[in-house]
């Protein structure tokens, strides 16, 4: 979804793989097993422990670069990490579920399916099981951050298992979950706020830097995939490809046409919202296409992105408007003399929200949330393009002469017109057909019989009708201009 604040293990994981590394909506979280699995065992307090922020030697810029470089790994160690978010609602009233209902679901999952609880100030705010976790977005959007897996079959099985578990617990409570990119019915004032102190900092800051940041926090859902790279050059090619093609993915997966009970004028309102959330930390990052781009250039960019907060002495310190560069030299007025740890750097990287994000892997962030088949299709689309050398080279060749102006045009227009967006002498649909074939070819060459996961994408492109346009058609015909039936149509 949006404010990326996923529950993350705040220490640097030794494998550095593309795990379902959480896009965090600005929240540093440590999950340190302290009790038995499931059955109400708590994983630990979610804020970073004091031990986690003890200083050894001051960080240098080289340390920050080395952190990103540590993500490089040989192809045989590449993994697929998939994340998705969904809206919980009361089946009888369609209203968004409140925190106490979410807490009961989390407790039910822990009790029945052997998850560890993640607790913050006596509130259960997430679950962890092995390398996968469940976390809450600011408005209670329910997120699965998947484990790093080898094949799309494993990824889809993980998604299906999660949806089965959530449905089993939720149905008994009269709660359903909706797979869509933007809350279709309820106003911002109707959305509950999760009991997480750090969100207050973001809620206060967002209106200062854009008009749609609160919508992003509370009313959007996404599906994304996190993928690995082998070297700086491999990272650069994948970053280029991901940014160039992100609007194409946005078109294919466009699924947020409603707002407060009626059409909103967009096929992907979720995507549009990111254009007026906080332009200091979002967008298409044109500097990535400069000849000088590499890990160090991304570090320079991130150093100047305004911070949200620092966690010290069991408190979140509001550092909005200050840069990590200030932090590096102990010049945060709100925390005088404090110097950052790698923990702080990792958490800062998760508060940057471009269409493709670099951490120790690359995150493809352009797709709306959707029903379960599309949760499997999104990672399949990108794996076929980025994990196959031949397809990656073909895409690099295809997009190498696209200008920054053309990429920005696609970013701006696709949320409105989807596959029908003009591009050069054709339309985005024409591009999508060619790109889909390259993705299929890439999956074929992987040899895991994964091409079937692209059926949903194939159906959208061959018909030329995005998921959002299909919903709009139902709204005008069968649903008799009511959005209420979407809660059943896109129910998990």
Curated annotation (Swiss-Prot):
Superkingdom, taxonomy of origin: Eukaryota
Localization, UniProt: Plastid, Chloroplast
EC number(s) stated in the UniProt entry for this protein: 6.3.2.2
Any Pfam family matching the protein: GCS2
GO cellular component terms listed in the entry, alphabetical order: chloroplast
Disulfide bond residue pairs: 156-376
Post-translational modification: The Cys-156-Cys-376 disulfide bridge is known to modulate the enzyme activity according to the redox status. The oxidized form constitutes the active enzyme.
Known pathway: Sulfur metabolism; glutathione biosynthesis; glutathione from L-cysteine and L-glutamate: step 1/2
Main enzyme class: ligase
Reactions it catalyzes: L-cysteine + L-glutamate + ATP = gamma-L-glutamyl-L-cysteine + ADP + phosphate + H(+)
Coarse class of the protein's main subcellular location: plastid
GTP-binding is among the record's keywords: no
Keyword Disulfide bond listed: yes
Keywords of the record: ATP-binding, Chloroplast, Disulfide bond, Glutathione biosynthesis, Ligase, Nucleotide-binding, Plastid, Transit peptide
Protein name, as recorded: Glutamate--cysteine ligase A, chloroplastic
Lineage start: Eukaryota, Viridiplantae, Streptophyta, Embryophyta, Tracheophyta
């Amino acid at each position: 979804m949006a404010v990326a604040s996923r529950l993350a293990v705040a220490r640097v994981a030794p494998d550095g793989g593309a795990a379902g590394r959480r896009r965090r909506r600005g929240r540093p979280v440590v999950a340190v097993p302290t009790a038995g699995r499931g059955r109400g065992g708590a994983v630990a307090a979610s804020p970073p422990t004091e031990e986690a922020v003890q200083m050894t030697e001051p960080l240098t810029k080289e340390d920050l670069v080395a952190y990103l470089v540590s993500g490089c790994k040989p192809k045989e160690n590449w993994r697929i990490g998939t994340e998705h978010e969904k809206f919980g609602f009361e089946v009888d009233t369609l209203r968004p579920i409140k925190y106490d209902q979410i807490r009961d679901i989390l407790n039910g999952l822990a009790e029945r399916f052997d998850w560890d609880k993640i607790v913050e100030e006596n509130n259960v705010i997430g679950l962890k099981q092995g390398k996968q976790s469940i976390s809450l977005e600011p408005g209670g959007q329910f997120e699965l951050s998947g484990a790093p897996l080898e094949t799309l079959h494993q990824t889809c099985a993980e998604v299906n298992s999660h949806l089965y578990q959530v449905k089993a617990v939720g149905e008994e409570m009269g709660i359903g979950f909706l797979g869509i990119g933007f809350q279709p019915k309820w106003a911002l004032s109707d959305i509950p706020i999760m009991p997480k102190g750090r969100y207050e900092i973001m809620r206060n800051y967002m209106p200062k830097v854009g008009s749609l940041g609160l919508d992003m926090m509370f009313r959007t859902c996404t599906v994304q995939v996190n993928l690995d790279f082998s070297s700086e050059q491999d990272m650069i090619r994948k970053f280029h490809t991901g940014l160039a093609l992100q609007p194409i993915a946005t078109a294919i997966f466009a699924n947020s046409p409603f707002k407060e009970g009626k059409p909103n004028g967009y096929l992907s309102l979720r995507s549009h919202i990111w254009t007026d959330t906080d332009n200091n930390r979002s967008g298409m990052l044109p500097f990535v296409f400069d000849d000088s781009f590499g890990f160090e250039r991304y570090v320079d960019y991130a150093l100047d992105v305004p911070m949200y907060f620092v966690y010290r002495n069991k408190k979140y310190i509001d550092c909005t408007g200050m840069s990590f560069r200030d932090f590096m030299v102990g010049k945060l007025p709100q925390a005088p003399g404090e110097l950052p740890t790698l923990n702080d750097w990792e958490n800062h990287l998760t508060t940057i929200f471009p269409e493709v994000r670099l951490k120790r892997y690359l995150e493809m962030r352009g797709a709306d949330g959707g029903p379960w088949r599309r949760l499997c299709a999104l990672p399949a689309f990108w794996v076929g393009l980025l994990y196959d050398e031949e397809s990656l080279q073909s895409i690099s060749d295809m997009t190498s002469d696209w200008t920054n102006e053309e990429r920005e045009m696609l970013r701006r227009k696709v949320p409105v017109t989807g596959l029908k967006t003009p591009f050069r002498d054709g339309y985005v649909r024409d591009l999508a057909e060619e790109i889909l074939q390259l993705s299929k070819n890439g999956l074929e060459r992987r040899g895991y019989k994964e091409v079937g996961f692209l059926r949903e994408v194939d159906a959208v492109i061959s018909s030329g009708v995005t998921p959002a346009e299909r919903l709009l058609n139902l709204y005008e015909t069968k649903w008799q201009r009511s959005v209420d039936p979407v809660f059943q149509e896109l129910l998990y």
